[in-house]
Each structure stands twice: as structure tokens, then as C-alpha cells.
């Protein structure tokens, strides 16, 4: 298993030029996920086209996780499968957990390359015998009926994003505005030596708990992840406690 750093200077996109020839030749598949958790990176058209060319050149299977496809705030996003040649090299996964709030149902779907889907079906048939039927029927209803709930969910997350990010900026913590997902990926203040030190002090002084970036890998050091899952009142209370703590002065 080879991991790839997702860095701010490359908009948290995979840099294919950093993948050495031996790694590329030995690789059997590449797991890609945009919009990305935890970095909030969003892939553009050029990235997907490069991904397909790279996969074809090195005979690599692409497994694209598009769970946050509907949680984009700066215009519509893309499916990997929209691009020419994508179905030749990979499949795409999606989930009803984020779009429809069905996290507890544990249901999603995959589509794309027929051969890969066939192998996935064979694997699933050996692991389990399918989802509980009422859950499947509920998922079908979610996918086929009025989709205004999706826009409502997106707007709610966007509102919380704006509230949290602008609030952090107002107390002296200058963090980036994410383009998508239900998270905020924030660089820790310069005066703290590492993510865990910042997380501990923030919690001790304010009761606000965030996730240290290094929990997601070594390249996450220096960052924290915050989830946009709390009410406006809770976010405002957290910002007030953070402001009073003096940590951002």
C-alpha cells in the first residue's frame, strides 16, 4: 500500500508527477475520493482527465469514492464517470449517508466498469446476502422522489460553514473556506507546535473538541478537522468560548 500526500499547494489533489514509475507499474488499483474528507479538496475537470490517462497508461483500476457529491457549495461538481474513458478504467461509489442523512442505514451504490462491478458483486455475495429489504426500498424512494431535500441539506451545511469560518476569522483564526463536504480543514495557529497540543489546549480551555490532523496521516500534521454537524446556537457558543479563551490573540 502506497499513500499519496494531499497538499494545500496542489489544492489537495493527487500530484501524478510525484508517483515514481515503479510504484505506478506495481499498482493494481488507486483509491481516489473527491470531494475529499478530511481536506475538503474538490477535483476539477483537468484532474479527472489526468487520472484517466494515468490509469490507462499503467493499467490501474480506479475506485472513486464520491460520497460528498451533493455537498458542494460553489456550483455543481462532477462524477468521475462523466469523463471519456472513465468506464474503461474504474468505478465510482456513492452513499446515501451524506446526501439523504441515512448514515445509520449503511447503504450506497457503485457503478462503472462492467467487469469490476461483476467482481464486486461476487465479493459481496460471499460477504453478505444483501441489504435489509425495507432499507433498500427506503433508498429507492430517496433517490427517485422529489430532491428538494438535497438542496435543503446543502444549504444548511453551507450556512454552518459560513458561520464557523467567518466566526473563526473574526476572533483571529484565519482559516480557509471549504468548497465542499461537511467539514472544515483548518491550519492550526502558528504559536502551537503540533496538532495534538492545540487540540488538547483548545479542549481544556473551551470544551470545544476538534480532530487533530495527524489522525488522518502524517501529512495532516499542523491541521485540525471540524465537522459542520452542530446547530447554529452550538457553533456560536463554541466561537464565544474560543474568543474568550485568548488562544487566538
What are these regions (language model features)?
Residues 1-249:
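PLP-dependent class I/II
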